[in-house]
A protein has these predicted regions:
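Membrane-helix interface segments
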Residues: 21-24, 53-58, 85-86, 120-126, ...
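N-terminal transmembrane-helix/juxtamembrane module of multi-pass inner/ER membrane proteins
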Residues: 1-41, 73-100
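Membrane-water interface at transmembrane helix exits
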Residues: 48, 72-81, 117, 165-169
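Residue-level signature of the transmembrane alpha-helical core
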Residues: 30, 45-46, 63, 129-133, ...
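Membrane-embedded catalytic cores of phosphoryl/pyrophosphoryl-handling enzymes
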Residues: 89-170
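Interfacial segments of alpha-helical transmembrane regions
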Residues: 44-72
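Hydrophobic alpha-helical transmembrane segments
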Residues: 35-48, 130
Length: 170
């Protein structure tokens, strides 16, 4: 297991972008934050408030799914207790959530993409399916997760998405 964790750390370190300002780093920062839970809670709240008969149940299903997934992620994180990679960026994450496994961001974005595939509309599903892996990779690029964290998050988010589709199927 130790060798696997060392390989994970080496691969993750290769994926990191420089700490100095630049276009790639700026894009990675925006992508990494676009999966933040507060952003999605606010957006889904607005969608429910302003949306019509299609969007209101959509927003509630996604919100309830995100909340349930967050609880599962927290239980796993505080059971495994894997420390985040060392680094400068993400001080808020490092203080409020020092554990990296699994990536809650990766789990959340995959869950959202799968729900969009199931509920539609299809153009949104396509956009979210492109966006989700970019968010997850940006988390590694910014140094707040290891590659295995986002892989586990993807698996967890996909499983949660399939379950949520069964629960919220119309």
């Amino acid at each position: 297991m130790k060798r696997l964790l060392e390989l994970d750390a080496r691969l993750s370190a290769r994926m990191r972008v420089a700490e100095s300002p630049g276009m790639l780093r700026s894009v990675a920062v925006v992508l990494a934050h676009s999966g933040d839970s507060w952003f999605w809670w606010a957006g889904l709240g607005l969608l429910w408030w302003l949306g019509g008969p299609f969007w209101r149940p959509w927003a509630l299903a996604v919100l309830y799914s995100i909340l349930a997934l967050a609880a599962v992620v927290l239980v796993i994180k505080f059971t495994i207790r894997r420390r985040r990679p060392e680094g400068e960026w993400g001080g808020l994450y490092r203080k409020t959530d020092p554990h990296s496994f699994p990536s809650g961001h990766a789990a959340r974005v995959v869950l959202i993409a799968i729900l969009a595939i199931g509920f539609g509309p299809w153009p949104l599903a396509v956009i979210l399916c492109v966006w989700a892996p970019l968010v997850a990779l940006a988390r590694v690029a910014m140094g707040v997760h290891y590659l295995s964290d986002i892989i586990a998050g993807f698996v967890l988010g996909a499983l949660a998405g399939v379950i949520a589709l069964q629960i919220f199927a119309h």
